[in-house]
Amino acid sequence: MNPIVSGASVIAAGLAIGLASIGPGIGQGTAAAQAVEGLARQPEAEGKIRGTLLLSLAFMESLTIYGLVVALCLLFANPFAG
């Protein structure tokens, strides 16, 4: 394997997982803060808020998992390694 392609793949894998985790991390923090605020205002809506929060957190976390899959593909099943 070309050392330049190998080095670029490692850097790209690091960027893929790093950048893929920034957005969902911020989003999860914001969603959790808003859920706690909603629970403080309306404690009787706890079940509905919790269910919606868990579903939205799962969707946000899936974006990070996609970044991990891209990083693993770049490291172990590199399409650019001729």
UniProtKB/Swiss-Prot annotation:
It holds the Pfam family ATP-synt_C. It is a multi-pass membrane protein. The chain crosses the membrane at residues 7-27, 57-77. It is found in: Plastid, Chloroplast thylakoid membrane. SUPFAM superfamilies: F1F0 ATP synthase subunit C. Keywords: ATP synthesis, CF(0), Chloroplast, Hydrogen ion transport, Ion transport, Lipid-binding, Membrane, Plastid, Thylakoid, Transmembrane, Transmembrane helix, Transport. The record marks E61 as: Reversibly protonated during proton transport. F-type ATPases have 2 components, F(1) - the catalytic core - and F(0) - the membrane proton channel. F(1) has five subunits: alpha(3), beta(3), gamma(1), delta(1), epsilon(1). F(0) has four main subunits: a(1), b(1), b'(1) and c(10-14). The alpha and beta chains form an alternating ring which encloses part of the gamma chain. F(1) is attached to F(0) by a central stalk formed by the gamma and epsilon chains, while a peripheral stalk is formed by the delta, b and b' chains. In plastids the F-type ATPase is also known as CF(1)CF(0). Belongs to the ATPase C chain family. HAMAP family: ATP_synth_c_bact. F(1)F(0) ATP synthase produces ATP from ADP in the presence of a proton or sodium gradient. F-type ATPases consist of two structural domains, F(1) containing the extramembraneous catalytic core and F(0) containing the membrane proton channel, linked together by a central stalk and a peripheral stalk. During catalysis, ATP synthesis in the catalytic domain of F(1) is coupled via a rotary mechanism of the central stalk subunits to proton translocation. Key component of the F(0) channel; it plays a direct role in translocation across the membrane. A homomeric c-ring of between 10-14 subunits forms the central stalk rotor element with the F(1) delta and epsilon subunits. This is ATP synthase subunit c, chloroplastic. The gene is atpH.
